[in-house]
Amino acid sequence: MTNNKIETSQNILNSARGFLRIEQDGLRALEAQLDEHFVTAVEWLLACRGKVVVTGMGKSGHIGRKLSATLSSTGTPSLFLHPGEGVHGDLGVVARQDVVILLSNSGTTEEMLQLLPSLRSIGCQTVSITRNPSSPLAMQASLHISCQV
């Protein structure tokens, strides 16, 4: 190997190790945030007689799609509902016995907030997961889980 190749290889390894350290730190921070709200949310999911509906916009939507797919593949009936479609007629997929998980970094996404009155009318349990526990989404959901990573 040439010196340039060795330096490049070392840079790649250093970058990968640095990335993994950042992710480990994030997971440790997330672990420290787990509280009774998380326990309650898990209890709701375990007791759910309907399906788990997951919603989110943008990057939160991508995470929501993955969460819903993982739940479905492990035996929990689940679907992803795009919030924009939800406020324009697709809320018919949500029933009283469902649990709806609302993912939003800021907790202020307009489309997400527009869903809440209808979800309350349906009578389903809502769990918001946001970075901001004082956000409108956090305050208006049945339960909030803070996720500050």
Segments the model singles out, each with a brief description of its role:
Residues M1, K5-G50:
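An N-terminal, well-structured beta->alpha segment
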Residues L46, G50-V149:
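Glycine-rich phosphate-binding loops that contact phosphosugars or nucleotide phosphates
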